[in-house]
């Protein structure tokens, strides 16, 4: 019992955020206690992550994505095989061939869009604008997935688009009247409930972290703000709705939304990367597939999937050749992919480098 009482209330273990980096203008030790952590090259904070922001530190999430390496490898392949220097940041966001690829569901190898379920929804949605891809990226996750069929029907005019209040239309028009992003709720809270920027950001945090007690506190402010907003009151009357009931209806929908709330900035970034890979696959298929294969050399299941995709696309993959193959998969001037020797089981990079060295003598 004595030992149990001693241990009671103590922390069992500490965890480390996979990609959270704290930034400060002064030494971090002036603000928080830090400690070394096994297996980590950087020091970590002894404070729980929830308490870092309130004391004035910025936490940035720096994600390392394999897809970025695939894009870089693909651009290198294009330069070598076609002598074209392509800048991924200059890829147009209205390319017809790219959207055709998405509408066919030919998205194997495309970041965030290659699951069978996503392919099925893309074929039904027939996306023809970048905003559709952003919305699908946010909707295709547990919770909001149930809204995808309605989203698709509304896009094609098969289901009426309705707004609880006229003031909500500017913020929900792009998503066919369905609340998809946290930012939409933030903007509406300011327009309808007269929230300040700070209060709307607090609402975002409450939704993102699913802090239902804080949401309950904010509800009172929202109800009061809507009642004191003459534009909201007038709009409710035009709709023939009771102000109190309408406010509670809107807030109730937001509370349900809080269980799957997603931020648009995140979706835009991911959809942008997916669109870039879609453009590369549509216009430079051999170079793109070679890049995918090269970045998954040691994962035989991935290599098999991408080889099958090459076959489906009608791309020619040439067998390994000591006179032509390199460590990675490459593309020749005829648009054929040459198998990378490093993908051969039992052949290491050192052996490949030796072969290349010998043939170049």
Q: What are the residue ranges of the model-derived segments?
A:
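Noncatalytic, beta-rich nucleic-acid-contacting surfaces in large DNA/RNA-processing enzymes
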Residues: 1-361
């Amino acid at each position: 019992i004595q030992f149990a009482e001693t241990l009671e209330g103590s922390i069992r273990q500490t965890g480390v955020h996979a990609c959270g980096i704290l930034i400060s203008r002064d030494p971090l030790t002036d603000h928080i206690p830090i400690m070394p952590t096994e297996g980590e090259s950087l020091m970590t904070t002894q404070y729980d992550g929830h308490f870092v922001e309130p004391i004035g530190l910025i936490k940035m999430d720096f994600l390392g994505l394999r897809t970025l390496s695939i894009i870089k490898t693909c651009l290198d392949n294009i330069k070598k095989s076609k002598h074209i220097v392509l800048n991924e940041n200059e890829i147009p966001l209205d390319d017809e061939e790219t959207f055709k690829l998405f509408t066919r569901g030919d998205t194997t190898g495309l970041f965030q869009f290659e699951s069978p379920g996503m392919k099925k929804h893309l074929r039904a949605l027939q996306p023809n604008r970048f905003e559709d891809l952003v919305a699908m990226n946010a909707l295709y996750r547990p919770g909001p997935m149930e809204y995808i069929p309605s989203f698709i029907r509304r896009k094609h005019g098969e289901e009426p688009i309705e707004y609880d209040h006229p003031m909500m239309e500017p913020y929900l028009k792009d998503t066919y009247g369905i609340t998809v992003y946290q930012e939409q709720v933030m903007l509406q809270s300011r327009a309808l409930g007269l929230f300040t920027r700070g209060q709307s950001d607090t609402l975002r945090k409450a939704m993102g972290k699913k802090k239902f007690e804080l949401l309950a506190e904010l509800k009172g402010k929202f109800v009061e703000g809507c009642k004191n907003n003459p534009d909201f009151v007038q709009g409710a009357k035009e709709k023939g709705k009771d102000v109190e009931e309408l406010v509670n209806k809107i807030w109730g929908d937001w509370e349900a939304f809080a269980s799957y709330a997603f931020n648009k900035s995140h979706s835009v970034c991911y959809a942008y990367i997916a669109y870039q890979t879609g453009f590369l696959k549509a216009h430079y298929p051999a170079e793109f597939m070679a890049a995918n294969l090269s970045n998954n050399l040691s994962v035989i299941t991935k290599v098999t999937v991408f080889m099958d995709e090459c076959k489906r696309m009608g791309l020619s993959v040439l067998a390994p050749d000591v006179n032509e193959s390199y460590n990675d998969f490459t593309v020749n001037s005829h648009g054929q992919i040459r198998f990378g020797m490093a993908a051969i089981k039992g052949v290491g990079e050192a052996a490949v480098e030796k072969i290349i060295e010998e043939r170049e003598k």
